[in-house]
Amino acid sequence: MIHSRRWAAAAAALALLLTGCSSAPGAPALGAGRSEIIVQAGEDEIPGLQSTAEEYTRDTGVDVRFVQREINAQAISNFISQSPTGQAPDIIVSPHDNLGQLAANGVVAPVELGDSGEDFTKNAQDAVKYNGVSYGVPYGVESVALVRNNELTTAEPSTFDDLRADGHRVMKEQGVSYPFTVSQDPDAGDPYHLYPLQTSFGAEVFKREKSGEYTDELAMGGEQGHQFAEYLADLGKSGDLRTSMTPDIAKESFIKGDSPYHIAGPWDVAEIEEAGMDVTVLPVPPAGPEEARPFAGVRAFFVNANAQNPVAAQDFAANYLTRADAQDSLYESTGRPPASKTAIENISDDPLRTSYAEIATTALPMPAIPAMGAVWSFWGTAENGIVEGDGAPVELWDQMIANIEGQIQ
């Protein structure tokens, strides 16, 4: 999701790289016999892959060619249908939350990382596992954090109530409009951005095995969920949380100095920097008694189970994309906080993204299980209803739980 405008060099390099894409004149069909591998990646990722691809070709004689395509539901559907026919790329880049669907359809192959896997943060390693099997090479981890406008406040709130109190102080003393801003959606809600507050009450979305993998049993019901629902209702009643605050309104209000705090992911950093703001990135403080843990979205490389050049695809993924220089290069081209511990150390001169990367190490991987598809709509609608005061918070929450469980069954 990170904006690529800041990375101007990537755009210039891309024009050269695309001469090797399958869409270029004379490029071979994906299913043709070849001494090459095809990698499908996004516009901001291809420049960061080029040097690693060139090194691989020098070492092995196997060419690495790129297909530029942004990952969305249609791209995943196409990969699933084309993989068995030999028409899909050998490697794709995707958010990890598509892994459950890919693995269930048998279109991705396990990737053995060996010792190099230890350089990745634990949650990045966990995110690319499905049923105990590792399927991917992570490179970026994104989660939300608290961005503070240092010109309005230098407080470091230890609880979310402290944040609200400081936000109201700034509103009174400096005339800003909001105590904090956070992305919402008037129609669908936004449980993603509110998840750190929810987990601080101990109400994770699904229960997890000892290994950390998710089961399809909901964990956000019961007393912990009720406490979060009551807190949401209070946020809505006070006017601190507004369902009308769209992503653009939240970001623009913070950038123009109308809020001292902003809950957002690293995709907003480039515009904040362009505005010349003096900001600090902090963990979201807890609203409840436990640590506030946001979702982590892990960007990773996955190998086609039906790759036309499976040995080379596995070799490139496990032995080249895991290298420190490859991970550094991907950070430079995409701006995504790294999944590699070494790469995190190497960006110490970028304090904002370093903070995001460090905060993301404690984030919870977004569930990649199929049951997650039953959650979002009911979850967001229920949260909106609670914030808007459409009913008793506990009753609305319990109805949401019943609706989701009905869908999962």
Where are the model-predicted features located?
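A structural signal for short loop-to-beta-strand junctions that line the ligand-binding cleft
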Residues: I80-S81, A88-D90, G117-E151, E291-A292, ...
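Hinge/lid segment of periplasmic solute-binding proteins
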Residues: H96-S143, D162, V281-L282
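Long, aromatic- and glycine/proline-rich binding clefts that accommodate carbohydrate-like moieties
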Residues: V128, L330-T381
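Extracytoplasmic/periplasmic solute-binding protein
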Residues: Y135-Y139, V144, R164-E217, S259
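Glycine-centered hinge/linker elements that transmit conformational signals in sensory
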Residues: G212-S244
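Conserved C-terminal helix/tail region of periplasmic/extracytoplasmic solute-binding proteins
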Residues: T361-Q409
